[in-house]
Amino acid sequence: MAIDLVGQKIGMTRLISDDGSIMPVSVIKIEPNRIVQTRTIDIDGYRAIQVTTGKKVNKKGEAKVRRISAAIKGHYAKASQEIGLGLWEFKLEDNEITNATSIDISLFGAGHYVDVIGKSKGKGFQGGVKLHNFQMQDATHGNSISHRAIGSTGQCQEPGRVFKGKKMAGHMGNKQVTQECLKVVKVDIEKSVILVKGSIPGAIKGFVKVSLSPKKDNSNKEVSKNIKNQVTNEVDQTKQM
């Protein structure tokens, strides 16, 4: 199971290659994910890490902790971590290392393929034509008012009802969407930003989860630093302190 990182969608831009071709890319800012809690099989029954990212600050850059409950403050204090913008939990395999204090963007490298999970933009209540791509009814020929109506949904006397799961008008968007196998075009470790080819789900400043795609072979790609080495180095530094 790949280790996920939490980032924020900054927007989209384009890269122009030497031959003049244009590539649309999405910009994801991934600040270091600080580990707040490590769940173990002995205590919790499964292995996982709970991470946070960013800092809660006001417009002046001061820490914004007024509306945070004492329980959450104590949860962060127990891990000696600053209060972040949220908490996310990722399950781990038995052979994955969890003795780190944080995981950063060096997990990814140019040429890697990643999966991005985000929440799609909410479109509100929409009809069947927009939500499910239903065909519209006649614009004329005696049709009045019901141009965009979905039409008949039930049967006659038998069964005389509408089956569950029938596509109808309803809320559109605001659901979890996974975009698979997106190629990492560029990694900027200093700015904590990665560029991936194509679009990703969600609105600007929305949180997304990024992980190496299990459907692609990422083992032979060049990376800035292996995640295992990163974790080991942090553990060694902690012991020296």
UniProtKB/Swiss-Prot annotation:
Pfam families named in the record: Ribosomal_L3
Keyword vocabulary terms for this entry: Methylation, Ribonucleoprotein, Ribosomal protein, RNA-binding, rRNA-binding
Segments forming a coiled coil: none
Domain of life: Bacteria
Post-translation changes: Methylated by PrmB.
UniProt-listed GO biological process terms: translation
Positions of post-translational N5-methylglutamine modification: 157
GTP-binding keyword on record: no
One GO location term (cellular component): cytosolic large ribosomal subunit
SUPFAM superfamilies for this protein: Translation proteins
Keyword Transport: no
InterPro entries: Ribosomal_uL3 (IPR000597), Ribosomal_uL3_bac/org-type (IPR019927), Transl_B-barrel_sf (IPR009000)
Molecular functions (GO terms): rRNA binding; structural constituent of ribosome
Assigned protein family: Belongs to the universal ribosomal protein uL3 family.
Record's function text: One of the primary rRNA binding proteins, it binds directly near the 3'-end of the 23S rRNA, where it nucleates assembly of the 50S subunit.
Subunit and partners: Part of the 50S ribosomal subunit. Forms a cluster with proteins L14 and L19.
Name used for this protein in its record: Large ribosomal subunit protein uL3
Lineage: Bacteria, Pseudomonadati, Pseudomonadota, Gammaproteobacteria, Candidatus Pseudothioglobaceae
